Amino acid sequence: KDRLDANAVAAQVPMGAEDNFWGVIDLVTMTAWDFKADEKGMTYPEPMDEIPAEFADIAATKREELLDAAASFDDELMEKILMEEDFTVEELKAALRKGVLANELNLVFVGSAYKNKGVQELLDAVVDYLPSPLDVEAVTGTDPDTGEEIQRHPSFDEPFSGLVFKIMTDPFVGKLTYVRVYSGRAESGSYVVNAS
């Protein structure tokens, strides 16, 4: 929390460190994953039957911190936690997502991209917690023909609008244009007007 100057909460606990890093404990599901060194991250591991005893205490402590953080964003979840009632993983993820979307909670994940350990879990977390295009508010622009201010919502049903943010030439493919699409669809071979 001090280093990041943010409300950082662990979503995972590492098993091992540095060259001896061999697994991850997911605090949302309380599942442990053993990334076998001889597989070099080529296969997705099966969850372990239980959390190893030497990591049980730290996992329980960090899980409590995660639940406290999640409960502050969802009153129903807070009530269930206080009353010691069961709650689902989906309810916990939804509460955590509220905090992340409000930019009031920063979940911390562990892994090694070099050894492909914990990478899939991180990518799953991107889907579970970070904003999707549907969470983004409508963008406002100007109609190039009328000068009228218009809004585009992130929907396939809206007319196409986008922003070219990079153009490059590839020796094998030719000219490549990178576009941030705000609404609609761009079909192959279609013409798009540059309004600027």
Language-model features and meaning:
Residues 1-196:
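Structural and coupling elements of P-loop NTPases
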